[in-house]
């Protein structure tokens, strides 16, 4: 049996930009994305705390420190300054769950890392 579980998340990131004319995705500061084990092209779920929207997109790495930019159609689901949660899931076998440790990255208002933990 396989279980879909939380793989990692960036908690309470602030949207720094929204680019309707870009071809989809969420641009995330590369250092921040990698601290959450998010790979370029990885599917993520976005939860907008301000308006309750939930939607899926994929990660691209950004060069700007603290950058969180929703692109394409996803740009219509956020406003600059909104607080979001970026979530990735993965599929695990029962045996893999013995060593299950999701990565939780907490950030401040500038999207700088406050803490990284492995507890749900």
UniProtKB/Swiss-Prot annotation:
Top-rank lineage group of the source organism: Bacteria
Sample GO molecular function, one term: aspartate 1-decarboxylase activity
Main location class: cytoplasm
Cofactor: pyruvate
GO annotation, cellular component aspect: cytosol
UniProt enzyme class: lyase
Single GO biological process annotation from the record: alanine biosynthetic process
Catalytic activity: L-aspartate + H(+) = beta-alanine + CO2
Active site annotation, chain numbering: 25 (schiff-base intermediate with substrate), 58 (proton donor)
UniProt binding sites for substrate: 57, 72-74
UniProt modified residues of type Pyruvic acid (Ser): 25
Keywords: Autocatalytic cleavage, Cytoplasm, Decarboxylase, Lyase, Pantothenate biosynthesis, Pyruvate, Schiff base, Zymogen
Similarity annotation: Belongs to the PanD family.
Full protein name: Aspartate 1-decarboxylase
Classification of source organism: Bacteria, Pseudomonadati, Campylobacterota, Epsilonproteobacteria, Campylobacterales
Annotated gene: panD
């Amino acid at each position: 049996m396989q279980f879909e579980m939380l793989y990692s998340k960036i908690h309470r990131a602030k949207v720094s930009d929204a680019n309707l004319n870009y071809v989809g995705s969420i641009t995330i500061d590369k250092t921040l994305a990698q601290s959450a084990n998010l790979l370029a092209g990885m599917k993520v779920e976005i939860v907008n705390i301000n308006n309750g929207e939930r939607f899926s997109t994929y990660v691209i790495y950004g060069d700007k420190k603290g950058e969180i930019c929703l692109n394409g159609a996803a740009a219509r689901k956020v406003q600059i300054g909104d607080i979001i949660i970026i979530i990735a899931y993965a599929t695990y076998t029962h045996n893999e769950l013995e060593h299950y440790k999701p990565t939780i990255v907490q950030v401040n208002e500038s999207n700088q890392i406050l803490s990284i933990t492995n507890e749900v």
